Amino acid sequence: TVPGVEEGVVERFLNGRAKGKNIEGFTDIKAFVDSIAIPRKIMMMVRAGSPVDELMDQLFPLLSPGDILIDGGNSNYEDTNRRVQLAESKGFLFVGSGVSGGEEGALNGASIMPGGSEKAWPEVKPILQSIAAKAPDGTPCCQWVGPAGSGHFVKMIHNGIEYGDMQLIAEAYWVMKKLLDLTNEEMADVFARWNEGKLRSYLIEITANILRHKDKSGGYLIDKILDAAGQKGTGKWSVINAMELGMPLGLIATAVFERSLSSQKDLRHLASKQFQCQHTQPIYNKAELVKNIFSALYASKLVSYAQGFAVLQRASDAFGWHLDLASIARMWRGGCIIRSIFL
């Protein structure tokens, strides 16, 4: 429990969003476990790392043989490999499931990528598919990925591709702003127009919205956001694992490094004084250059996804996972951050 933050969270939820719904809340873990029909299906959504192991240690003595634990956090796939073996050695089943969608996904359906103990799939399939997002053709964005930590490996690569997409959008924004001198509204119009064609995606859509958003003072919020990006680790893991598998992941690696560079604000500020960005000649045909930026962004996106899926294939071969790459692409068509017509 986080002091001052999580006390009373169950009560607030029951009196808020859950009010009038068939939802029970518990503050005692034993009472919670005892309330669930056997075989129990318990989904853990906690911070990756030791908190998952600590929660599992609390749950193990309370479970019955055949019960299923689902880790829906951003766990490292190697941790999931270990947890699958540990749970199965105790007579339980373990599912390591990538989940993408953020707060909106929690409310309206996420992209869910389960892997681990395959015997658990028939039990958890109706539950996970019922809360998953639906693709445009109505297919649930949730299918079985494979054994061991494959589900979390797929989510890791998803996040790496997400890093790449965001970096490409940031660079397109920078060129339009610094080289073409487009206003926020003009750039918003460009991104909105792109979102009507083959670049239509969640990230392009929200970029247009962000560029138009104004704060309470009436100024554009984008101009007041610190240009320093953090990261939680999955992008870095993608690059490390690609290197260990001997696969190129250059675009995503650069996106990870750019995030690291962005956090060095003082150094960048000093460098910006020494190396001024100046126009050498006026830009006459801005519309033509915007078309070129579109083409460059689309081509770069192709490279990013091709590299990401190549890493998935190499991991599948190396670990004997037998991943269905087409099924994975279909799972990413809705709910997740990289959902797009591209997929």
How should each PLM-predicted stretch be described?
Residues 52-56, 76-189, 197-224, 258-288:
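Rossmann-fold dinucleotide-binding core
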Residues 1-8:
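Glycine-rich phosphate/diphosphate-binding loop of Rossmann-like nucleotide-binding domains
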Residues 193, 316-343:
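Small-residue-rich helix-loop
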Residues 176-188, 242-247, 318-321:
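Inter-helical turn/loop segments and adjacent helix faces that build the functional surface
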